Swiss-Prot record:
It catalyses: AMP + ATP = 2 ADP. CDD domains: ADK. Catalyzes the reversible transfer of the terminal phosphate group between ATP and AMP. Plays an important role in cellular energy homeostasis and in adenine nucleotide metabolism. This is Adenylate kinase. The gene is adk. HAMAP family: Adenylate_kinase_Adk. It comes from Corynebacterium aurimucosum (strain ATCC 700975 / DSM 44827 / CIP 107346 / CN-1).
Amino acid sequence: MRYVLLGPPGAGKGTQAALLSEKLGVPHISTGDLFRANIGEGTPLGLEAKSYIDAGKLVPTDVTARMVEDRLNQDDAKDGFLLDGFPRTVQQADILEKLLSDKDLKLDGVLNFEVSEDVVVERMLARGRADDTEETIRTRLGVYREETFPLIEHYGDAIISIKAEGTVEEINERTLQAMGK
């Protein structure tokens, strides 16, 4: 079971991935968590990632791809994963496809969490992260629209659309139904 989770920042991807991971027994691999771990440990990749995150910009593909590849190579991800935050661009999607095809693997689907911009801003301000100022949120939404939205076209029929408004439980139930679980 290998899924990518798409949607704007604040769409609830991380929340849903954590619930799905627990229910389905596959790891939730979040680039945000990978970045925070590397930043917290002061690794060179982490320090580089921090400068971009603090500015509300996407971390460069080579940095992110190396973190993701290392994580996908860990034992708990061999039978599946829920990938949250990568790919964000068509270039990254091609990198992921190659990483998987090198192991004779492919994605089972792409969960696209759809939510209004007003709900995104409200949710992100409420969670109180240091990197979530209103200016940073709006910058990230602009970057998402410009760079990430083309993934929906790229993935085409693999896209599974999820209405990501309502309670956490309602969204989780919709997601499990859409996955056929």
